[in-house]
Amino acid sequence: MKRFLLCSFTLILLYPAGIDMYLVGLPRIAADLNASEAQLHIAFSVYLAGMATAMLFAGKIADRSGRKPVAIVGAIVFMMASLLCSQATEGSLFLSGRFLQGVGAGSCYVVAFAILRDTLDERRRAKVLSLLNGITCIVPVLAPVLGHLIMLRFPWQSLFYTMSAMGIIVCLLSLFILRETRPARLAPRDLSRSSHAAESLINRFFLSRLAITTLSVSVILTFVNASPVLLMEVMEFSRGDYAITMALTAGVSMVVSFSTPFALGLFKPRTLMLVSQGLFLTAGVTLSLAHTNTVTLFGLMLICAGFPVGFGVAMSQALGPFSLRAGVASSTLGIAQVCGSSLWIWLAAILGISALNMLIGILIGCSIVSMLLILSVAPNRSISEHEEIHNQSRP
């Protein structure tokens, strides 16, 4: 079991590392490529576009050909794309590398969730996803620090050499440590009609959890996107104060994430999901009424506490009905989360909504819609029939 957890963690880790590690070198990258920082900020959107593109096909391939081949190919693509970014001499080549990085990270991300679905029951899966969420919260804090230390002695290309090395490590783990978890009884070229019917993506429960997780990811990405403007322009924080504040928010997320597995032993998953949305609603109201920086910061901390309480549980429930199509289900969730959150941020920017109101709007909207879905769409008894765990992994 440890091998599956180790491999799943490293597969997921490529996604946040690809976002956060290079940011500290952005000014030097822009100078060397004769591009403005504003032009290179689109690299974030290009990276997410690459992830969404990979998710369109990675899940289905993983269900038909296996988790291991997709993980290996994804890691190789991430590694090669990182090298391409390091050798870029102009902006378009750099953005091409970022897109391919997203393709590699997206493929690995989908496989990681499929592996967890294959090997863990719902309660253990929810606990592990909460722990993984806590660990990945460390990356946005540590990655820029590591990047800064690297750039004290080496050029910005070393940031991408480091990411390439991460891709090599993930590839080696996938090649020699990871065992295939795809159900042995799943035919490689076709699925029976009865299996498709039993595990259809078009069912109320899955769609409700897809909506909840998409809205929750939209909240956290809106927070990340709006935080520089909100903290440094509206609240007039210095860069140092901003860094400290973001480290504190990451710390809150980590503490709550590591506490959630223990809470799952005391409370029902539905209770934790309602608590999560209650914290989002409280945060939205707090931010809308805040007149001081202290109250605003309290509202931001509530966001970082609310997300890890319910996200892992909701993801676990969403994957629960899919014994044979975990890859497709994982892809669908990933695409919805990436595209849904990007669409909200884009629409808010087009409409000229301020950073604070953008955050308040998604907090209140997410909490109300999610609470209604949690209360009105409960897991069906038939879902438990499909909660099959495929521990008999093959080499």
From Swiss-Prot:
One GO term describing the cellular component: plasma membrane
Membrane topology: Multi-pass membrane protein
Gene3D superfamilies linked to this entry: Multidrug resistance protein D
Transmembrane segments: 4-24, 42-62, 69-89, 93-113, 131-151, 158-178, 212-232, 247-267, 271-291, 295-315, 328-350, 355-377
Keywords recorded for this protein, A-Z: Cell inner membrane, Cell membrane, Membrane, Transmembrane, Transmembrane helix, Transport
InterPro entries: MFS (IPR011701), MFS_dom (IPR020846), MFS_trans_sf (IPR036259), Multidrug-R_MdtL (IPR023697)
Predominant location category: membrane
Protein's cellular compartments: Cell inner membrane
Highest rank taxon of the organism: Bacteria
Gene Ontology molecular function: any one: transmembrane transporter activity
Pfam families registered for this protein in UniProt: MFS_1
HAMAP family tied to this protein: MFS_MdtL
Family that this chain belongs to: Belongs to the major facilitator superfamily. DHA1 family. MdtL (TC 2.A.1.2.22) subfamily.
UniProt name for this protein: Multidrug resistance protein MdtL
Species classification: Bacteria, Pseudomonadati, Pseudomonadota, Gammaproteobacteria, Enterobacterales
